[in-house]
Amino acid sequence: MNVIYASDDGYAWLMGVSMVSLFENNRECKEINVYLFGDKISKENEEKLYQAAKQYDRNLEIIDVNKLKLPEKLYSGRYPKSAFSRLFAFDLLPQDIDRVLYLDCDIIVDGNIEELYNHKMDNKIIWAVKDCVSKAYKQKIGIKGDDVYINTGVMMMNLDKMRKFPMEERITEFVDHYAGVMDYADQEIINGIFQGEFGILPPQWNVMTQFNQYSYSQLKWIRHPHHYYSAEEIEYAKRHARMFHYTTCMLNVRPWFGNSRLNNAHVFNRYLRISPWKGVAKKNMNFSAGKYKTMRALALLPEPITNFCLGMLHAYLKPYYSIIKQKISK
């Protein structure tokens, strides 16, 4: 099994906890090779990462992404180089690797994942779980409302097919057109340039924060997802989660902060306690004053009104503002 992560030094310890959860739940897997596309990883974190891999008798290789030549359009002070490195996994990894599992650093593996790794690729470039976004959110980056928008936190990647894809050309075209409206640049680039090349996984392979913090009806109100999973599929995923994805979601605080109140934070803490970072002191997360006041004010309203306002903001006002802004700038 070949697995990749991408991280700068700030997230290296979270990647390490994720890696420990991967090893802990896949002990019977004959071989696991982890490749970290690292950006200026400190000596201290490097040593701890290698220590964790050695403890489980697994292989870890840290690849310096600063040696990677990215398309000029991707050079930006807003995003670390590691954020885009997964787009070039086919170039950074040994050429005899034909498939790889990509995991975000905020993923916790809570079960055996060999079934996922051995999933048939069926000539798709990427297999992933659908993200919970509206039709307007897709349209702002040129995706038709009925087309798929994936969450890129967990991806089975077909490297053989990626090697034949005109990556630099398609990235340059996409960024030229949509740079001004992208909120999550690497995820939106992947969704934009690989449309029609996705295979869809059941949601238990990427159980995101919103699954556990909101009911299905609340999710529908807040996100207005289009062509999404059924309530039954989401409920099954919550009961049979193989991976938890601690995504940002409204005012929910992620579990590596001291003031987290997530109802599944204990899963993260379980693996933190058996990792080389078990002594890390958790800091409290501080929200920007404007966002905090707005969200607190919304929270004081009756729940249906709060959900309606959040839904209008996330599913319509924000993406349509981006679309109008883009048209004006042309």
Spans of model-derived segments:
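Short internal beta-strands
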Residues: 32-40, 128-129
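Hydrophobic targeting segments
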Residues: 2-5, 22, 33-36
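GT-A fold catalytic core of metal-dependent nucleotide-sugar glycosyltransferases
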Residues: 62-68, 82-134, 147-149, 155-157
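Active-site-proximal specificity loops/subdomain of glycosyltransferases
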Residues: 44-92
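Histidine-anchored nucleotide/phosphate-binding helix
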Residues: 12-27
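Short, surface-exposed amphipathic charged segments that create phosphate/polyanion-binding patches used
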Residues: 73-82, 141-145, 215-220
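Conserved nucleotide-sugar donor-binding
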Residues: 154-167
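A glycosyltransferase accessory/donor-loop signature
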Residues: 7, 164-330
